[in-house]
């Protein structure tokens, strides 16, 4: 039997302020609200579901257990310059990037959203990632 390949289509992010995060995801990334969550909202770009959850900075599980989770997320854009203008206008702050001519690398630019969450944008993608996919039937 062939090994199945599973597709990542959902990420849950702990945010300090759901309303601020939701507005940023709408304004910066053009995402839309897909529904409510128990402690937040579900956003979508038409392919991915991203839950923005108010967890008060607490990790799941044991209260004093170290939390290991999402360090940042990335978005594949058509026009990097336009995307940079859009995320900055929505309140993002630039803090780094990988030079476009670094060998064995892809170019990405890192930002923090208004709640402090780290994300990057790229027009060249990531190894193994596919930019456009066919959505599931409704």
Residue ranges of each PLM-predicted region?
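Amphipathic alpha-helical segments
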Residues: 17-32, 89
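Conserved short beta-strand elements that form part of the metal-binding/catalytic scaffold
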Residues: 32-66, 111-113, 118-125
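N-terminal beta-strand motif that seeds the catalytic metal site of vicinal oxygen chelate
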Residues: 1-20, 49, 70-77, 124-138
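Vicinal oxygen chelate
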Residues: 1-4, 7-16, 44, 62-138, ...
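Short secondary-structure junctions
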Residues: 30-36, 93-98
């Amino acid at each position: 039997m062939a090994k199945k390949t599973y597709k990542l289509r959902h990420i849950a992010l702990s945010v300090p302020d759901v309303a601020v995060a939701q507005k940023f995801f709408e304004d910066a990334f053009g995402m839309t609200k897909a529904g409510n969550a128990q402690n937040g909202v579900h956003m979508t770009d038409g392919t991915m579901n991203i839950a923005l959850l108010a967890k008060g900075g607490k990790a799941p599980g044991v209260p004093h257990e170290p939390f290991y989770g999402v360090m940042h997320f990335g978005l594949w854009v058509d026009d990097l310059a336009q995307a940079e203008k859009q995320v900055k206008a929505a309140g993002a702050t630039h803090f780094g990037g990988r030079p476009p001519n670094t060998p064995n690398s892809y170019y990405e630019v890192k930002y923090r959203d208004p709640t402090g969450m780290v994300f990057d944008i790229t027009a060249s993608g990531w190894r193994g990632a596919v930019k456009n996919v066919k959505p599931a039937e409704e």
